[in-house]
Amino acid sequence: MIKVIKKKSHSGLKKRIKISKKKKLLRGHAYKNHLAASKTTKQNRQLRGVTCVKLCDYNRIKTLIRGL
């Protein structure tokens, strides 16, 4: 019998992506870790919270986190 190796989930991506109840992939915004003083208040406010992964990236990310 041939032993099949299980595919592992991408551990770095598992920490950055959450899955909603409707199976949407939620991610945080970029450009908010430092140098926030040079950004406007509106920019910093809009970078808070999470957003959904775009459809063009969805299938690629879904294959990387197959275990979740």
From Swiss-Prot:
Pfam families: Ribosomal_L35p. GO terms for biological process: translation. GO terms for cellular component: ribonucleoprotein complex; ribosome. One of its GO terms (molecular function) is structural constituent of ribosome. InterPro entries: Ribosomal_bL35 (IPR001706), Ribosomal_bL35-like (IPR021137), Ribosomal_bL35_CS (IPR018265), Ribosomal_bL35_sf (IPR037229). Keywords: Ribonucleoprotein, Ribosomal protein. HAMAP family: Ribosomal_bL35. Belongs to the bacterial ribosomal protein bL35 family. This is Large ribosomal subunit protein bL35. It comes from Onion yellows phytoplasma (strain OY-M). The lineage of its organism: Bacteria, Bacillati, Mycoplasmatota, Mollicutes, Acholeplasmatales. The gene is rpmI.
